[in-house]
Amino acid sequence: MKKLLIILSLLFLYSCGTKEEVKNDEDLTMLQKKIDQFAKTEIKYDHSLLNPNQKIVVQKLFEAAKIMDELFLEQVYSKNFEIREKLLKSTDPKDKLTLEYFNIMFGPFDRLDHDKPFYGENEKPLGANFYPEDLTKGEFDAWLENHPDDRETFTSEFTVIRRIGDSLAAIPYSEAYSEELTKASQILKEAAQFADNKTLKDYLVKRADAFLSNDYYESDMAWMDLKDHTIEVVIGPYEVYEDKLFNYKAAFECFLTIVDPAETRKLEIFKNYLTDMEKNLPIPDEHKNFERGSESPIMVVQEVFGAGDTKAGVQTLAFNLPNDERVRKAKGSKKVMLKNIHEAKFEKLLYPIAELVLEKDQLQYVTFNAFFNHTLMHEMSHGLGPGFIKVNGTETEVKKELKETYSTIEECKADILGMWNNLYMIEKGVFSPDTENQIWTTFLAGVFRSVRFGIGEAHGGGNAIIYNYMLNNGAYSFNKESQTVSVNYDKAKEVLKNLANELLMIQALGDYEGAKKLIADYAVNSESMKILIEKLNILPVDINPVFEIAR
């Protein structure tokens, strides 16, 4: 009997061990698949464009950029450093893969899968680490109702909200991240000493001061004034996408780039049309915004290094900054196009996607120039339309009224107006008429590049709205038999105009309920979208940049 019990116990232990091994193998396979969604891609830049002093500046800025990585990691989740330390110390192969994906995602939450945890079971707080994890919208709003004098600091882009006893308090970034920002400030001042260009030197010194004062206005103005410079850098807290509770709080990032002078000169013509583009918006004149500055420089650059918010998950193609409406009113905004990132994404992602989702006879219209020009017009379109608005007689900003819906609505608007303005450039004779089909078709292929990022993410959600709206209104057709999609060129412009009007009026009126309804109705994973996305499983979702400077 005793022998039988021993044998049964051993069989039970063996069975449990086998199951555990199978589960572990499945976990390893799953993690490797997640990592393989991002194609490792070397990002090089032309060293010959830099003189010896500029090379020193770039190296210093690279050191400062790495601090932005650490700051953003802290902003994403309160336990990020603890988790990373545990994974770094582990010798378990599963933890090694988990760490690799953690580094891509800047935390244990899968940005491609609605922020579901891939390590541990805790859900990601909507407010990331900008607010107490248990803070609700209701509690935040009630606090402001009872403490109206706190509104400005609590809704500031550059404060974190913390509990102190039974109270809530807004802590400036300069205090909350004092150690890191003091170090970054020092490095920027060191870099400024080697900067030959006076405008770059001025920006670096003012941005260094801003890290300590928490006032970024003067340094944003100085960034807009950069002139005849080779090094194009932006560093600090900018985008609010990570704050899904209110879209109030700015995340730290850095774009370290060098200017491509020949390509930049080619695009100078477009900035002359900004006022005309505003006039051409499909909304009543009373809602058009002619008070923004019109300097609006456009730069084509090679990215040397990206850090923080811009590097988490999906890589940025271009940016349009600053976001401060006061700076935009005075000077406009700067559009910066990352050409080497565009080239990598077109080759590895966009064209292979087009081959799988588009009707074969429309594939001929997918071109790199249409892809690049759409990104340009997308960024220019961020600077168009309502900014400061009046709601119930009170002056406010679109982003404050639309709250957590703002990022998705704004990205959707920029993509819709990106097409609208490319078509306008045909009317103005800047582009030839034969580019029209390229504009429509290349964008449609690009929709499926974006929605793979997850429709809970601002760009993916914005593109889902466009796809479903255009499909439902006859601008796109889905062929069930071939499982492909196509543009109905004769219907597309009218449908585009209607959606542009709806988005712009939501912004002009600060219509929070209208924004929520549009997102609920159209930012959905519709049947045809599911089928088409399923076909793309054999392709990477994005690139995983291996920056030459970081090797």
Segments predicted by a language model, with ranges:
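N-terminal helix-rich structural modules
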Residues: K23-A195, T199-Y203
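Sec-dependent N-terminal signal peptides
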Residues: I6-L8
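Fold-level signature of zinc-dependent metallopeptidase catalytic domains
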Residues: L31-Q59, R151-T408, C412-D415, W420-Y424, ...
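C-terminal motif of bacterial Sec signal peptides marking the signal peptidase cleavage site
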Residues: F12-S15
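Long, well-structured alpha-helical subdomains associated
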Residues: M419-K516
